[in-house]
Design a protein with these regions (language model features):
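A short alpha->loop->secondary-structure connector
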Residues: 43-53
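Long, compositionally biased charged/polar accessory segments in the mid-to-C-terminal portions
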Residues: 76-186
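Gly/Ser/Thr-rich loops at beta-strand to alpha-helix junctions
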Residues: 28-38, 57-59
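Short glycine-/acidic-enriched loop or helix-start segments at secondary-structure transitions
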Residues: 37-40, 168-169
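Generic beta-sheet signal
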Residues: 24-30, 48
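Short, charged, surface-exposed secondary-structure boundary motifs
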Residues: 58-67
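Short, small-residue-biased leader/transition segments that mark boundaries at the very start
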Residues: 1-8
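A short, well-structured juxtamembrane/interface segment
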Residues: 9-19
């Protein structure tokens, strides 16, 4: 139920706050609204590192439950759910359109057409260049890297804070400078 999921979400913030009070470092990855909620909830942010995922909108959990039920999938039996596969963009069935294979799936189609979001996503105050996290991650659709590099998988990484710089310096990722205007123009 929706009330149960709200309790679960609050419990996550309580658990994180407890770890911060114990002096532990915590890396929280979530949607911008979830990061903002955690920052509003937490009083101990010195050891809190945040990463937000550049969001296209969050589909309704109830719609996902309906979709899985329609596909005869028992949500209690799921060990994981992958929305993104490089080979098929996470879509499940194949049809034909204009002479080339076209992947069709109503759940993903609704997501890509922005018609299945939770209500607050339609007026999201975090859908801007002003970010709430130390680092923002998203698709790098506007990358100027070669097609060969793109096949390896690339992401847009935006660093907003000293904590973000600290995380990136400790990471083992290859970073390239990007034109922020171009990068943002290709995101949703």
């Amino acid at each position: 139920s929706s009330a149960a999921s709200d309790v679960y979400k609050r419990q996550i913030y309580i658990d994180i706050e407890r770890k911060l009070q114990e002096g532990k470092k915590v890396l929280f990855v979530g949607l911008p609204c979830q990061v903002a909620a955690l920052k509003n909830f937490s009083r101990n942010q010195d050891n809190l590192y945040t990463v937000d995922l550049i969001c296209h909108g969050s589909p309704s959990p109830e719609l996902l439950k309906m979709y899985l039920k329609e596909k005869s999938v028992d949500i209690e039996e799921l060990e994981g759910l992958n929305f993104r596969e490089k080979t098929s963009f996470g879509l499940r069935s194949v049809g034909k359109n204009n002479g080339f294979p076209r992947i069709v799936d109503m759940y993903t189609y609704a997501f890509l057409k922005s018609i299945d979001y939770t209500e607050n996503c339609y007026s999201c105050r975090y859908a801007s260049q002003s970010r709430v996290s130390d680092i923002s991650l998203g698709d790098s659709w506007g990358s100027e890297l070669s097609e060969e590099e793109k096949k390896k998988g690339i992401s847009l990484v935006l660093c907003q804070t000293k904590k973000g710089e600290e995380l990136l310096k400790k990471s083992n990722v290859e970073l390239f400078d990007a034109d922020i205007t171009r990068a943002v123009s290709y995101t949703h």
